[in-house]
Amino acid sequence: NSVHPCCDPVTCKPKRGKHCASGPCCENCYIVGVGTVCNPARGDWNDDNCTGVSSDCPPNPWNGKPSDN
């Protein structure tokens, strides 16, 4: 078994001082900055961008549509 550099193997949570262990918006144990593209635009859809507060990549809207639709 290898030890994950970001995750405490006992608690299964990020180690002290680390913010995340995995995800498209997590890099080197830290959440990437707001606006970082985590899924490039395709067709009529906009880029998906990191929020700066989560390691998940939230879906962005279709071009011209508000994000709460």
From Swiss-Prot:
* PROSITE patterns found in the cross-reference section: DISINTEGRIN_1, DISINTEGRIN_2
**Assembly information from the UniProt record:** Heterodimer with subunit alpha; disulfide-linked.
Q: Which Gene3D superfamilies match?
A: Disintegrin domain
Q: Which SMART domains match?
A: DISIN
- Report the main location listed first in the record: secreted
Location of the protein in the cell: Secreted
- What is the disulfide pattern of this chain? 6-29, 20-26, 25-50, 38-57
Protein name, per record: Disintegrin EC6 subunit beta
Q: InterPro entries from the entry?
A: Disintegrin_CS (IPR018358), Disintegrin_dom (IPR001762), Disintegrin_dom_sf (IPR036436)
- Quote the function comment for this protein: Potently inhibits adhesion of alpha-4/beta-1 (ITGA4/ITGB1) and alpha-9/beta-1 (ITGA9/ITGB1) integrins to VCAM1, and adhesion of alpha-5/beta-1 (ITGA5/ITGB1) integrin to fibronectin. Has a much less effect on alpha-IIb/beta-3 (ITGA2B/ITGB3) integrin. Also potently inhibits neutrophil migration across TNF-alpha-activated human umbilical endothelial cells.
Look up the record and report any one GO term of the cellular component aspect: extracellular region
UniProt note on tissues of expression: Expressed by the venom gland.
Q: What else is known?
A: The disintegrin belongs to the dimeric disintegrin subfamily.
Query: Which domain of life does this protein belong to?
Result: Eukaryota
Family listed: Belongs to the venom metalloproteinase (M12B) family. P-II subfamily. P-IIe sub-subfamily.
Native organism: Echis carinatus sochureki
